[in-house]
Amino acid sequence: HTAYRRQRQMCIRDRDMEYKSLLETTQNTRDLGGYETCYGRKTKSFSVLRSDRQGYASDRDKKFLVNHDITTVIDMRTEEDVKKKPSSLTNVKGMTYYNFPVYEGSKVPNSVEEVPFSFLKIAEEPNMKAIFECIANAPQGVIFNCSAGKDRSGVVSAILLLFAGAKDEDIIENYVVTKYYIKQRPVSYTHLR
Protein backbone atom coordinates (compact mmCIF):
# COMPACT_ATOMS: atom_id res chain seq x y z
CA HIS A 1 0.00 0.00 0.00
CA THR A 2 2.86 2.39 0.78
CA ALA A 3 4.38 1.93 -2.69
CA TYR A 4 0.99 2.52 -4.30
CA ARG A 5 0.41 5.73 -2.29
CA ARG A 6 3.88 7.00 -3.17
CA GLN A 7 3.30 6.12 -6.84
CA ARG A 8 -0.05 7.95 -6.82
CA GLN A 9 1.48 11.04 -5.15
CA MET A 10 4.34 11.01 -7.64
CA CYS A 11 1.92 10.84 -10.58
CA ILE A 12 -0.19 13.71 -9.24
CA ARG A 13 2.85 15.82 -8.35
CA ASP A 14 4.75 15.23 -11.58
CA ARG A 15 1.86 15.22 -14.04
CA ASP A 16 2.90 18.54 -15.59
CA MET A 17 6.64 18.07 -15.21
CA GLU A 18 8.69 17.95 -18.41
CA TYR A 19 10.37 14.59 -18.97
CA LYS A 20 13.39 14.71 -21.25
CA SER A 21 14.81 11.71 -23.04
CA LEU A 22 18.60 11.34 -23.00
CA LEU A 23 18.58 11.22 -26.81
CA GLU A 24 17.11 14.04 -28.86
CA THR A 25 15.45 11.72 -31.40
CA THR A 26 13.78 9.33 -28.97
CA GLN A 27 11.00 9.84 -26.47
CA ASN A 28 12.01 7.48 -23.71
CA THR A 29 15.76 6.89 -23.35
CA ARG A 30 16.69 6.75 -19.67
CA ASP A 31 19.60 5.71 -17.47
CA LEU A 32 19.08 2.86 -14.99
CA GLY A 33 21.92 4.33 -12.93
CA GLY A 34 21.59 6.23 -9.69
CA TYR A 35 19.08 4.00 -7.91
CA GLU A 36 19.82 3.28 -4.25
CA THR A 37 20.15 -0.43 -3.52
CA CYS A 38 19.67 -2.56 -0.42
CA TYR A 39 23.46 -3.08 -0.50
CA GLY A 40 24.13 0.54 0.43
CA ARG A 41 25.30 1.54 -3.05
CA LYS A 42 23.75 3.03 -6.16
CA THR A 43 23.32 1.43 -9.54
CA LYS A 44 26.08 2.54 -11.90
CA SER A 45 25.28 5.46 -14.19
CA PHE A 46 25.46 4.88 -17.95
CA SER A 47 26.00 1.16 -17.52
CA VAL A 48 22.52 0.30 -18.82
CA LEU A 49 20.08 2.54 -20.71
CA ARG A 50 16.47 1.70 -21.55
CA SER A 51 14.90 3.20 -24.65
CA ASP A 52 12.30 3.24 -27.34
CA ARG A 53 13.48 2.49 -30.88
CA GLN A 54 16.34 4.51 -32.35
CA GLY A 55 15.03 4.73 -35.90
CA TYR A 56 16.38 8.19 -36.55
CA ALA A 57 19.31 8.62 -34.16
CA SER A 58 21.04 11.91 -34.92
CA ASP A 59 24.81 12.29 -35.10
CA ARG A 60 24.57 14.01 -31.71
CA ASP A 61 22.73 10.98 -30.27
CA LYS A 62 25.31 8.57 -31.67
CA LYS A 63 28.15 10.70 -30.31
CA PHE A 64 26.44 10.84 -26.89
CA LEU A 65 26.22 7.04 -26.77
CA VAL A 66 29.82 6.54 -27.92
CA ASN A 67 31.08 9.16 -25.44
CA HIS A 68 29.28 7.31 -22.63
CA ASP A 69 30.88 3.99 -23.66
CA ILE A 70 27.65 2.37 -24.85
CA THR A 71 28.96 -0.50 -26.97
CA THR A 72 26.05 -2.96 -27.01
CA VAL A 73 22.63 -2.33 -28.60
CA ILE A 74 19.84 -4.83 -27.86
CA ASP A 75 16.69 -4.43 -29.96
CA MET A 76 13.70 -6.45 -28.69
CA ARG A 77 11.37 -5.55 -31.56
CA THR A 78 10.04 -8.27 -33.85
CA GLU A 79 11.80 -9.01 -37.14
CA GLU A 80 8.82 -7.48 -38.94
CA ASP A 81 9.11 -4.22 -36.96
CA VAL A 82 12.88 -4.08 -37.49
CA LYS A 83 12.39 -4.60 -41.22
CA LYS A 84 9.79 -1.79 -41.42
CA LYS A 85 11.73 0.63 -39.24
CA PRO A 86 15.41 -0.37 -38.95
CA SER A 87 17.56 0.81 -36.08
CA SER A 88 19.96 3.59 -36.96
CA LEU A 89 22.52 2.14 -34.53
CA THR A 90 23.29 -1.02 -36.53
CA ASN A 91 26.43 0.36 -38.17
CA VAL A 92 27.84 2.74 -35.56
CA LYS A 93 31.58 2.22 -35.15
CA GLY A 94 32.37 0.67 -31.78
CA MET A 95 28.83 -0.63 -31.23
CA THR A 96 27.52 -4.16 -31.65
CA TYR A 97 23.83 -4.52 -32.55
CA TYR A 98 21.71 -7.53 -31.53
CA ASN A 99 18.09 -8.25 -32.38
CA PHE A 100 16.49 -10.57 -29.82
CA PRO A 101 12.78 -10.41 -30.69
CA VAL A 102 10.33 -10.50 -27.80
CA TYR A 103 6.90 -11.11 -29.31
CA GLU A 104 4.77 -10.75 -26.18
CA GLY A 105 4.22 -7.06 -25.53
CA SER A 106 4.61 -6.12 -29.19
CA LYS A 107 0.84 -5.67 -29.41
CA VAL A 108 -1.65 -4.09 -27.02
CA PRO A 109 -3.35 -6.65 -24.73
CA ASN A 110 -7.04 -7.30 -25.48
CA SER A 111 -8.19 -6.20 -22.04
CA VAL A 112 -6.96 -4.54 -18.85
CA GLU A 113 -7.21 -7.92 -17.13
CA GLU A 114 -4.59 -9.33 -19.53
CA VAL A 115 -1.92 -6.71 -18.71
CA PRO A 116 -0.37 -8.42 -15.63
CA PHE A 117 -0.29 -11.75 -17.49
CA SER A 118 1.36 -10.02 -20.44
CA PHE A 119 4.21 -8.86 -18.17
CA LEU A 120 4.71 -12.43 -16.96
CA LYS A 121 4.67 -13.71 -20.54
CA ILE A 122 7.28 -11.09 -21.51
CA ALA A 123 9.54 -12.30 -18.69
CA GLU A 124 9.11 -15.90 -19.89
CA GLU A 125 9.92 -15.18 -23.55
CA PRO A 126 12.61 -17.51 -24.97
CA ASN A 127 14.94 -14.62 -25.91
CA MET A 128 15.02 -13.23 -22.35
CA LYS A 129 17.90 -15.57 -21.48
CA ALA A 130 19.89 -14.29 -24.47
CA ILE A 131 19.09 -10.67 -23.54
CA PHE A 132 20.33 -11.03 -19.97
CA GLU A 133 23.42 -13.00 -21.05
CA CYS A 134 24.21 -10.26 -23.56
CA ILE A 135 23.85 -7.57 -20.86
CA ALA A 136 25.95 -9.59 -18.39
CA ASN A 137 28.73 -10.16 -20.94
CA ALA A 138 28.75 -6.71 -22.53
CA PRO A 139 32.25 -5.20 -22.59
CA GLN A 140 30.91 -1.77 -21.57
CA GLY A 141 27.55 0.03 -21.50
CA VAL A 142 24.31 -1.34 -22.95
CA ILE A 143 21.24 0.27 -24.47
CA PHE A 144 18.17 -1.89 -24.97
CA ASN A 145 14.90 -0.99 -26.63
CA CYS A 146 11.53 -2.13 -27.84
CA SER A 147 9.15 0.06 -29.86
CA ALA A 148 7.92 2.57 -27.25
CA GLY A 149 10.35 1.66 -24.47
CA LYS A 150 7.40 0.73 -22.30
CA ASP A 151 6.36 -2.88 -21.73
CA ARG A 152 9.23 -5.06 -22.98
CA SER A 153 11.86 -2.51 -21.92
CA GLY A 154 9.93 -1.97 -18.69
CA VAL A 155 10.02 -5.66 -17.78
CA VAL A 156 13.76 -5.94 -18.53
CA SER A 157 14.39 -2.76 -16.50
CA ALA A 158 12.33 -4.08 -13.58
CA ILE A 159 14.21 -7.39 -13.53
CA LEU A 160 17.62 -5.66 -13.72
CA LEU A 161 16.72 -3.21 -10.94
CA LEU A 162 15.31 -6.06 -8.84
CA PHE A 163 18.54 -8.05 -9.24
CA ALA A 164 20.55 -4.94 -8.36
CA GLY A 165 18.61 -4.58 -5.10
CA ALA A 166 16.66 -1.41 -5.95
CA LYS A 167 13.64 -0.53 -3.83
CA ASP A 168 10.28 -1.85 -5.02
CA GLU A 169 8.81 1.65 -5.17
CA ASP A 170 11.70 2.84 -7.37
CA ILE A 171 11.17 -0.09 -9.73
CA ILE A 172 7.46 0.74 -9.97
CA GLU A 173 8.18 4.43 -10.44
CA ASN A 174 10.67 3.65 -13.23
CA TYR A 175 7.87 1.89 -15.10
CA VAL A 176 5.10 4.39 -14.32
CA VAL A 177 6.93 7.51 -15.51
CA THR A 178 7.16 6.00 -18.99
CA LYS A 179 3.70 7.36 -19.76
CA TYR A 180 4.99 10.90 -19.19
CA TYR A 181 7.99 10.37 -21.45
CA ILE A 182 6.00 8.93 -24.34
CA LYS A 183 3.47 11.78 -24.21
CA GLN A 184 6.12 14.27 -25.27
CA ARG A 185 7.48 13.71 -28.75
CA PRO A 186 10.85 15.43 -29.19
CA VAL A 187 10.70 18.42 -31.54
CA SER A 188 13.58 17.06 -33.62
CA TYR A 189 11.65 13.82 -34.17
CA THR A 190 8.28 15.19 -35.31
CA HIS A 191 9.43 16.18 -38.79
CA LEU A 192 10.61 12.61 -39.45
CA ARG A 193 7.14 11.02 -39.19
Please identify what each model-predicted range represents.
Residues 152:
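Conserved SAM/SAH-binding loop-helix junction
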Residues 15-143, 155-193:
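Cys-dependent protein tyrosine phosphatase-like superfamily
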Residues 1-14, 191:
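Single conserved hydrophobic/aromatic residue that forms the stacking wall/gate
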Residues 146:
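Short cysteine clusters
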